């Protein structure tokens, strides 16, 4: 991977309906966005990391912290559309879409995400982690099922696969919202209209699957907590404080 120019982009909007201004909410005394940026830089695998936002409040935060940021249009339909705006002005081989609500990312997550690009046919990658029992029916925890070769078959907020006979299936996998794209695949995503399933599930990655574009799902060690609610915020804060000890 050292020969590839990998650019990390953190799409950061403050219009979240479930947890308004969540990327700027404080966790252990620092805005969540600062934790995410630091985690991305600590991976050691991204040549550059920058914030992409449509909010002046986020731009001001970046200026105060000395973090690279770029202003993107408000009408971007998804985080990946925002990454594509960045790609039009900054060249790279691989673009990593880093969710601004994942402050618990570690270098191991980035290693797992980027390793599949050693295979030339891989165009898009993302991650899965074990799904805990209390997350299986939680629509905020997106489940993923894959083919034997790691290609994603489907992502859903519903419980997939459905254990019809209650046989005690224990292999549920949760999607971790970290994506990496070769430039051509990123362009293809951004030039396609939002798809039917994408709009139903509110999951941008379904735009690729509905249009026949493979997503390689790498299995990552451990799990994280994506911050969608006040409860998530408190749980992440406790875990990050313990990690700092």
Curated annotation (Swiss-Prot):
PANTHER family associated with the record: 3-DEOXY-MANNO-OCTULOSONATE CYTIDYLYLTRANSFERASE, 3-DEOXY-MANNO-OCTULOSONATE CYTIDYLYLTRANSFERASE, MITOCHONDRIAL
Places the protein is found: Cytoplasm
Function: Activates KDO (a required 8-carbon sugar) for incorporation into bacterial lipopolysaccharide in Gram-negative bacteria.
Name of the protein this chain belongs to: 3-deoxy-manno-octulosonate cytidylyltransferase
Enzyme class: transferase
E.C. no: 2.7.7.38
GO biological process, one term: CMP-keto-3-deoxy-D-manno-octulosonic acid biosynthetic process
GO CC annotations on file: cytosol
Pfam family, one: CTP_transf_3
Domain of life from the UniProt record: Bacteria
Source organism of this protein record: Acidobacterium capsulatum (strain ATCC 51196 / DSM 11244 / BCRC 80197 / JCM 7670 / NBRC 15755 / NCIMB 13165 / 161)
């Amino acid at each position: 991977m050292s020969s590839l120019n990998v650019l990390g982009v953190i799409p950061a909007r403050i219009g979240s309906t479930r947890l308004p201004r969540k990327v700027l909410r404080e966790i252990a005394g620092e805005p969540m966005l600062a934790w995410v940026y630091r985690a991305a830089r600590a991976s050691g695998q991204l040549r550059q990391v920058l914030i992409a936002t449509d909010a002046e409040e986020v731009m001001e935060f970046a200026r105060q912290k000395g973090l690279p940021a770029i202003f993107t249009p408000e009408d971007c339909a998804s985080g990946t559309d925002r990454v594509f705006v960045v790609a039009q002005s900054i060249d790279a081989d691989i673009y990593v879409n880093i969710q601004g609500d994942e402050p618990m990312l570690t270098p191991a997550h980035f290693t797992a995400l980027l390793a599949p690009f050693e295979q030339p046919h891989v165009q898009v990658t993302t991650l899965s982690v074990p799904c805990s029992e209390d997350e299986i029916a939680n629509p905020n925890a997106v489940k993923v099922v894959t083919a034997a070769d790691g290609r994603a078959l489907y992502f859903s907020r519903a419980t997939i696969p459905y254990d019809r006979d209650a046989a005690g299936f224990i292999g549920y996998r949760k999607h971790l919202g970290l994506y990496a794209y070769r430039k051509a695949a990123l362009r293809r995503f951004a030039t396609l209209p939002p798809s039917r399933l994408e709009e139903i599930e509110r999951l941008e990655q379904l735009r690729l699957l509905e249009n026949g574009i493979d997503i390689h799902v790498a299995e990552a060690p451990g799990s994280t907590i994506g911050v969608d609610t006040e409860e998530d915020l408190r749980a992440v804060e406790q875990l990050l404080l313990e990690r700092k000890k």
